[in-house]
Amino acid sequence: MVALLFAGAFSLAFTLFLTPLFIKLFHRLQWGQFIRDDGPQTHHTKRGTATMGGIVIILASVLGYFVGHLLTWDGIRFDPVTPSGLLVVFMMVGLGFVGFLDDYLKTRKQQSLGLGGWQKIAGQVVVATVFAVLAITLRDPVSGLTPASTAISLFRDLPLDFMALGAVIGTGLFIVWICLIVASASNGVNVADGLDGLAAGASIFSIGSYVIIGFWQFNQSCDSVSSYQNEYRCYEVASPLDLAIIAASIVGALIGFLWWNTSPAQIFMGDTGSLGLGGALAALAILSRTELLLVFIGGLFVIVAGSVVLQRIYFKLTHGKRIFLMSPLHHHFELKGWAEVTVVVRFWIIAGLLVAAGVGTFYLEWITQ
């Protein structure tokens, strides 16, 4: 619990007080945002705003996680980091690097396209594949559990284990499943990062839910004394408290960053931030055994990304007609006349309600066992 509080407080202070220094540095490096001419006219004033703020978020989150553990030192030992926590860090940094390459190419070429679509997907697949292999190979030193399970999960593992099809086929399908989750979550956050503060605020709700879920799973762990009388309710999750610690560190970093990212934004997170955050969200869901619950917890990202898919399919089927004035969905409402801040706050409300529904059903499953 102490590590959780220290991690969140450190990362919040880091982004809140040091982001202005990074803004100056990024301007000096000429890392400014490129704005497309065919976007909403109100966005043209954003041209040149410092981007790649995801570097600040990721740096603060990682440092906060390790500092949180170091500050639990009692003169003899400190709470050790775990494979689960390190895997979340790996996913966030790995996808953040893919996003950084995309952002860097955009700023160098001064165009909206950095990496090609398939190049970006390839990077996500490589990171997700390494994550998947490590997640079923490493073992928690205390519980002996692997960080991830090869079963599909909702509130806990479902009786749908890929390994029932054999080790080779099962492992292959598990890797494909993980790649699908990672690509969906990271691209979902990436698509939502189109208005000042939208992705950062929504991510606070989504990733913040894993502080609650991780801490609850820790208290109801099958390894804890309190769960012996409720063995059918307990959770077989490796290092759930450490998942809560890294989630708290990310949330703290996002809150401090949002101070500078809210309208009018002085810095954007860029693909560095959005892909990294989406990767962290996917990793938290996979390692906490709540993969399918992402439909609620990442509900806003599902809606926004879904609007892009629907627009493209409808456009092709009708030979040029559109459902929305512009996709993603938040730009549709901008073109309808909504102020940017209005769209952002209302989308935050939707994100918060969907996260509440996700956490609520998670708890409801426990009390009805």
From Swiss-Prot:
Cofactor(s) essential for the protein: Mg(2+)
Membrane in keyword set: yes
Membrane-topology annotation of the record: Multi-pass membrane protein
Reactions it catalyzes: UDP-N-acetyl-alpha-D-muramoyl-L-alanyl-gamma-D-glutamyl-meso-2,6-diaminopimeloyl-D-alanyl-D-alanine + di-trans,octa-cis-undecaprenyl phosphate = di-trans,octa-cis-undecaprenyl diphospho-N-acetyl-alpha-D-muramoyl-L-alanyl-D-glutamyl-meso-2,6-diaminopimeloyl-D-alanyl-D-alanine + UMP
Record-level Gene Ontology MF annotations: metal ion binding; phospho-N-acetylmuramoyl-pentapeptide-transferase activity; UDP-N-acetylmuramoyl-L-alanyl-D-glutamyl-meso-2,6-diaminopimelyl-D-alanyl-D-alanine:undecaprenyl-phosphate transferase activity
Entry keyword Transmembrane: yes
GO process annotations (BP): cell division; cell wall organization; peptidoglycan biosynthetic process; regulation of cell shape
Family membership noted in the UniProt record: Belongs to the glycosyltransferase 4 family. MraY subfamily.
Protein name as it appears in the record: Phospho-N-acetylmuramoyl-pentapeptide-transferase
Gene name per UniProt: mraY
